[in-house]
Regions:
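Catalytic donor-sugar/metal-binding loop of nucleotide-sugar-dependent glycosyltransferases
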Residues: 95, 117-121, 130-148
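C-terminal, non-catalytic tails of nucleotide-sugar-dependent glycosyltransferases
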Residues: 167-173
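Short alpha-helical elements of helix-turn-helix
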Residues: 127
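Acidic donor-binding segment of Leloir-type glycosyltransferases
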Residues: 1-8
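Acidic metal-phosphate-binding loop of nucleotide-sugar-dependent transferases
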Residues: 38-39
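Acceptor/aglycone-binding surface of glycosyltransferases and processive sugar-polymer synthases
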Residues: 10-25, 30, 42-123, 150-162, ...
Length: 173
């Protein structure tokens, strides 16, 4: 069958909720989530598909592993991202350099298992997904991607940071 696109309208309950609902409703064998600001160029999608073809259950985009380039990112944002990922490795799930990159790819089986169990509606849902995938012994690859900083972010830096720290702690409960 040919790929199709459909839109879904949801009440605003956070990024985690929107991604969960979208990937549960999706019906492809491979399901890619990407940030709406397209901070990663669409030309890089092939890299995800090649890794999925190698048998990975989950492929996550990473700005922190060796190889990617970052364009126009403010130094404070980069620093805060490194601190948060350090915190995640200690508190929740180790082994990942960049849990918060908005580009992740799942097999349909992995997506159905993970998103039907995902609870967090906010910005830290990625941590919860990776923790569950690790506990389920899913095969995960962290893929270097080039990333372009976009100013039109909907994230309110201070309140979002506090919520992310709190939500990451909740993943342990």
């Amino acid at each position: 069958p040919e790929p199709s696109i459909r839109t879904v309208s949801l009440p605003h309950r956070g990024k985690g909720n929107a991604v969960r609902e979208g990937l549960i409703l999706a019906n492809g064998k491979i399901r890619l989530m990407c940030d709406a600001d397209l901070a990663m160029s669409v030309e890089q999608i092939d890299k995800f598909l090649h890794k999925m073809a190698e048998g990975y259950d989950v492929v996550i985009g990473s700005r922190e592993v060796k190889g990617p380039r970052r364009f126009d990112e403010p130094k404070l944002r980069h620093f805060m991202g490194k601190i948060f990922n350090w915190y995640v490795r200690i508190v929740a799930v180790g082994g990942f350099s960049d849990t918060q990159c908005g580009y992740k790819c799942f097999t349909s089986i992995a997506a159905n298992i993970l998103f039907k169990r995902q609870k967090l509606d906010g910005w830290s849902f990625d941590v919860e997904l990776l923790m569950m995938a690790t506990r389920k012994s899913m095969k995960i690859f962290e893929l270097p991607i080039d990333w372009y900083h976009k100013e039109r972010s909907k994230v309110s830096f201070g309140p979002a940071s506090i919520q992310m720290v709190r939500d990451t702690l909740l993943t342990r409960i």
